[in-house]
Every structure is written in structure tokens, then in C-alpha cells.
Amino acid sequence: MSGMHGASREALAAARERLDALTDSTSVDAGSLADELAAVTALLHREVSLRRVLTDPAQSARPRPSSPSVSSAPRSAAPVDLVAGTVRSRWSQSRDLVDALEQLANIADLTAAQKRGRLDNVEDELFRFGRIISSNTELRAALTSRSATTAAKSELLAGLLGSRAERTTERLVTRLVTAPRGRSLESGLESLSKLAADRRDRMVAVVTSAVPLSDTQKQRLGAALAKVYGRPMHLNLDVDPEVLGGIRVQVGDEVINGSIADRLEDAGRRLAS
């Protein structure tokens, strides 16, 4: 989804603005909206020919075909209007429309968590789940197996997350696992984490240290990184005794080793004084 260009990027930005306006209304249940958007996403992912017709620029000069399946997927007016506006936009390729609808569904779920004051928990849980997956090959194999049924994967996730994680976390991960749409589990979790951070207009730093950081160290490192990057910074923390230099910080594609991190902290203190 991050690879959208040109018309698709503009269409996605407009769709996200419409979604934000919709979820700002107290009468709209963001969680239910997420379910309905996810249903449309699944439908258009299956119906490739329909998706291509809906995104064909040649159709823009005349009414687009109406599909009973698409029109009946959302059950209330709000998602119908949102989906209709998104479909009417110009998309560079048909897959971009499905990617956009999926992203809208995920954002709606994250918005629901934000309204409940639970977004920080969801961010942390997505990161921790990613770390569990990377260290447990058997679990990863079970969740990505093509021979396992959707029901079996959902049941496994319910057992893992149901009583331990936020409901939003379970919903997001379950959708990703049961409908990966060609993505790896790791890249899907990373995309979800970025969306969660984006809800607060902040960046994510993955901090791996040889020993757990103290609260003071976390606060100082977060403040220093925020000053350097010019945006609030959410720290995803991991401990690995084999980390060279004692600490490793990754912000996007940029990796910062321990010595540079120390200089960042010093710079942050000087700016604050």
C-alpha cells in the first residue's frame, strides 16, 4: 500500500479524509464500519473482473456498472457512501482500490481503539506479536500454512490473543492472517504498526537494547529522537543481549548504533537547556 503512486495516492488521501470525517461523528460505530469495509475488500479481492471494470478509466465518462454484491455488502448508508466515493476515484491499477479499502477498514478499527483510549496498547501488542512470530517458527508456520483453514487460524489466534490482547489487536491480526493477499505476515504487521502510529501523527522507532532501558532512559531517548526527526516518536522496545554497542535504534530504513544514539541524547539535552 505504501507503494501507491500518482492518481492512487491522491485517491487514497481523499478516501482517508472522508473516513476521518465519518468517524468523527459520534453516531458512527467505527468497529462496525471496519467490518463492512473489510467485507467489501474481501469481495473485490475475489471478483477480479469486477474490480477491473470499476477501476477502468474508460468507464469514467459513463455510469459504472452496479453490482448487487457490492451494493449489498455494506448494511448502512455511511459505508455505502464511503465505498461509492472511493470506487468513483481514479486508481492507477485495480489492486490499489482493494488495498485502499483494506487500509480504510484497518484505520476504522484503530480509530475505535483510539476513541476508547486503547490505541497505545494496540501499538505495543502489534509489535510484541511480531516479535513472537519472528522467534517462533512453528507458530508462524501454523498461521501462514496454505493447508490450514481460515476457521482453524482464527481459532488459534483467539486462543493466543483473545484473553490477553485488545479486541482491536485480535481483529487486525485475524484479518491479516486469514486474508494475507500475497503479503508476508511480517510486512503486514509492520504496515499495521505504521498505521497505528500514524493515528497520532508520530513515527515509530524500534529500540533493541542489551538490557531493558529504565523509564528515564526511554524518556530521554524518545525526546532526543523526536527533536531530531521533528515528530513525536513511539518507542517499540525489545531486549537482545547480543546487540553490539548495547543499543540499536531503527527509524524506518535508518539504523542508529549505540554511539550515535548517545550523541543524539546529548544533542537533545543541549537543545532542551
Curated annotation (Swiss-Prot):
UniProt biased composition (Low complexity): 57-78
GO MF term list: proton-transporting ATP synthase activity, rotational mechanism
Sequence segments annotated as region (Disordered): 55-78
Signal peptide: none
Origin: domain of life: Bacteria
Location in or out of the cell: Cell membrane
One GO cellular component term: proton-transporting ATP synthase complex
InterPro entries: ATP_synth_OSCP/delta_N_sf (IPR026015), ATPase_OSCP/d_CS (IPR020781), ATPase_OSCP/dsu (IPR000711)
Family per record: Belongs to the ATPase delta chain family.
Role played: F(1)F(0) ATP synthase produces ATP from ADP in the presence of a proton or sodium gradient. F-type ATPases consist of two structural domains, F(1) containing the extramembraneous catalytic core and F(0) containing the membrane proton channel, linked together by a central stalk and a peripheral stalk. During catalysis, ATP synthesis in the catalytic domain of F(1) is coupled via a rotary mechanism of the central stalk subunits to proton translocation.
This protein's name: ATP synthase subunit delta
Annotated source species: Streptomyces lividans
Gene: atpH
